[in-house]
């Protein structure tokens, strides 16, 4: 797919593709915020990008079909359906996740789209045969959308735990750097994992930037975890906005460096930035890159699966075949750009965007 890739900010890596501002102007839209993956606005922007990308490498060729590769029925399935609707295209999606129970597939048809759900990544062979049976042609009129996180890289149920571990590593490193000698790793990890539960998603908005910031404030001693949990459960604190506003009223009690970090995060939050904790996300990028391609080809597969973010063999092989048949490959990621693309300084040291980093290709193991 080269650089036909967009991360959360919908800023194409390939400079030939239009920017989000250019797309909004062409569509006569004024969006207050960058749309998320499951929104109809996201789908309309992506449909515009896909048509432009197809024109770049195959002038005069029209997109007629979408083949989507993902790992979550709700998020990826919704995004897929919206994209097909926005482009007025038919489509079929493979939604995979490795599980220990016996092989099972499920087919859900709705309007001009089909979801093919499987509990094995190697069920892609069954999916490809299903496409043949349904006369779903994969050719120059087809766009193959490759979800990057936990599909193309770090296959869900097989290797995705490394992506999660890397995020925790980055959060730990960030908070440790800021708290210095006051940092208590056990206390931090207890707070992080406790508040990362579904019960607290209405409070944290299931946003990792918010969660890591909350853990930073807890680590500073400004607020203790037990009090916060009680406040959330009793609805005295119902949102992250309420929490950070309360912290802002107590900044005089924070050390100067933490006060500066708080002010930066609070300012970005008020401006509507969904990833306001930049230091954390930059560390997440560096930690991710450090877990790609560093062990070597002679490393036992199980060790690779436990320590590296790997390319999913089945997805890789299928994508190569589809590209050879003329399909357009386009990568999607809902991961923040700051956690996926190096800063200028990082790039000057040889760092590359996540999708360009070489790492091992691993499939199912017996």
Predicted features, each with a name:
Residues 68-86, 316, 338-344:
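Acidic, divalent-metal-coordinating active-site segment for phosphoryl/phosphodiester hydrolysis
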Residues 49-53, 64-76, 331-333:
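Glycine-rich anion-binding loop/nest that anchors nucleotide
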Residues 41-59, 315-317:
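A short, acidic, amphipathic alpha-helical segment used as a generic capping/interface helix at domain edges
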Residues 1-36, 96-98, 106-113, 135-365:
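Alpha-helical substrate-recognition element adjacent to the catalytic core
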Residues 89-103:
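Glycine-rich phosphate-binding active-site loops on the catalytic face of alpha/beta enzymes
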Residues 112-138:
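Short, basic/aromatic recognition patches
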Residues 62, 84-85, 108-118:
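Nucleo/cytoplasmic regulatory scaffolds in medium-to-very-large eukaryotic proteins
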Residues 66, 91-94, 329-330:
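Hydrophobic anchor at the start of a short beta-strand
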């Amino acid at each position: 797919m080269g650089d036909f890739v967009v991360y959360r900010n919908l800023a194409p890596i390939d400079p030939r593709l239009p920017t989000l501002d250019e797309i909004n102007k062409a569509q006569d839209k004024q969006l207050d915020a960058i749309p998320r993956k499951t929104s109809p606005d996201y789908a309309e922007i992506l449909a515009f990008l896909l048509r432009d990308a197809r024109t770049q490498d195959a002038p005069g060729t029209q997109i007629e079909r979408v083949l989507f590769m993902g790992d979550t029925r709700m998020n990826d399935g919704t995004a897929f359906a919206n994209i097909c609707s926005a482009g007025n295209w038919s489509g079929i999606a493979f939604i995979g996740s490795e599980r220990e129970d016996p092989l099972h597939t499920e087919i859900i048809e709705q309007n001009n789209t089909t979801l093919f759900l499987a509990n094995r990544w190697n069920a892609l062979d069954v999916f490809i045969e299903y496409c043949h049976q349904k006369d779903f042609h994969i050719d120059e009129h087809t766009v193959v959308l490759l979800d990057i996180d936990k599909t193309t890289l770090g296959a869900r149920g097989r290797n995705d735990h490394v992506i999660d571990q890397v995020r925790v590593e980055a959060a730990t490193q960030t908070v440790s750097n800021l708290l210095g000698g006051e940092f208590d790793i056990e206390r931090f990890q207890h707070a992080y994992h406790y508040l990362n539960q579904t019960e607290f998603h209405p409070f944290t908005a299931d946003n990792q930037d918010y969660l890591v910031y909350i853990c930073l404030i807890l680590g500073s001693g400004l607020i203790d975890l037990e009090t916060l949990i009680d406040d959330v459960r009793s609805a005295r604190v119902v949102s992250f906005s309420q929490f950070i506003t309360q912290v802002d009223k107590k900044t005089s009690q924070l050390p100067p460096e933490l006060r500066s970090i708080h002010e930066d995060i609070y300012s970005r939050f008020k401006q509507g930035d969904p990833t306001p904790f930049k230091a954390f996300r930059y560390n997440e990028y560096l930690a991710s890159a450090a877990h790609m391609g560093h062990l070597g080809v002679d490393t036992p597969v199980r060790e690779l699966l436990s320590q590296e973010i790997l390319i999913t063999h089945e997805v890789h092989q299928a994508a190569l075949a589809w590209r050879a048949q003329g399909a357009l490959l386009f990568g999607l990621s809902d991961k923040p750009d700051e956690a996926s693309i190096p800063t200028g300084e990082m790039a000057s040291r040889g760092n590359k965007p996540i999708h360009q980093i070489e790492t091992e290709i691993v499939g199912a193991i017996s």
